[in-house]
Amino acid sequence: MILFPAIDLKNGQCVRLEQGDMARATVFNLDPAAQARSFAAQGFQYLHVVDLDGAFAGKPVNAQAVESMLKVVSMPVQLGGGIRDLKTVEGWLAKGISRVIIGTAAVRDPALVKQAAKKFPGRVAVGLDARDGKVAVEGWAESSQVTALEIAQRFEDAGVAAIIFTDIARDGLLKGINWEATIALAEAVSIPVIASGGLASIDDVKALLSPRANKLEGAIAGRALYDGRLDPAEALALIDAARAA
């Protein structure tokens, strides 16, 4: 079970959004590399990064900030936002990103996901961000007419490393993860699922470690870490204890 600390990038800064709204961004750190270093020092073992500007632009925008983080941490980093073609996938993996997350293109161009996953086994994940049950695209600015489960099932035998499932309605609001929808997705597909959106407290970490969540690979923590509602040491100690049991 992995707890991924999140760094969302906007204008080269580390921010958190509310419900994916770029107009409701709170800056938490002007220096993403310093934030990444801090997460590493706290004991986290895998970093989750999103290029928010890239998600809207359809191409990498905060490359300089991402590269600055790669220089200061040795832990693996997964990256999403603006990854819409094979060249971008190849470019990020060559620069040291451990796993790329394909979101909009997974809906618009499923062949890209399959091609990338085949070429780079274990290094391609799919990001499914749902609003009212339907997957949103283009940096959450548009809603599609397909469900997360429908998209996930397209990639069952494609070699996708993980699915990051985000409930947009809860993202950045500290309302708790949508366990019902997340676990239902995890039980319906063989691809490992990572919970995202709304992680609020140590109670969510405990839920992550409960038997009903045993098909999940982990969860992403954002605002709860930044505003002190989740103590990294307590959360990681719980996970370590569960791993040792």
UniProtKB/Swiss-Prot annotation:
Compartments, as annotated in UniProt: Cytoplasm
SUPFAM superfamilies, sorted: Ribulose-phoshate binding barrel (SSF51366)
MF GO annotations: 1-(5-phosphoribosyl)-5-[(5-phosphoribosylamino)methylideneamino]imidazole-4-carboxamide isomerase activity
GO biological processes: L-histidine biosynthetic process; L-tryptophan biosynthetic process
UniProt keywords, alphabetically: Amino-acid biosynthesis, Cytoplasm, Histidine biosynthesis, Isomerase
Enzyme Commission no: 5.3.1.16
Cited InterPro entries: Aldolase_TIM (IPR013785), His_biosynth (IPR006062), HisA_bact_arch (IPR006063), Isoase_HisA-like (IPR044524), Isoase_HisA-like_bact (IPR023016), RibuloseP-bd_barrel (IPR011060)
Residues annotated as catalytic: 8, 129
Any GO CC annotation of this UniProt entry: cytoplasm
Pathway: Amino-acid biosynthesis; L-histidine biosynthesis; L-histidine from 5-phospho-alpha-D-ribose 1-diphosphate: step 4/9
Source domain of life: Bacteria
Catalytic activities: 1-(5-phospho-beta-D-ribosyl)-5-[(5-phospho-beta-D-ribosylamino)methylideneamino]imidazole-4-carboxamide = 5-[(5-phospho-1-deoxy-D-ribulos-1-ylimino)methylamino]-1-(5-phospho-beta-D-ribosyl)imidazole-4-carboxamide
Keyword match Cytoplasm: yes
Pfam families attached to this UniProt entry: His_biosynth
Gene3D superfamilies according to UniProt: Aldolase class I (3.20.20.70)
Major enzyme class: isomerase
Family: Belongs to the HisA/HisF family.
Protein's UniProt name: 1-(5-phosphoribosyl)-5-[(5-phosphoribosylamino)methylideneamino] imidazole-4-carboxamide isomerase
Name of the encoding gene: hisA
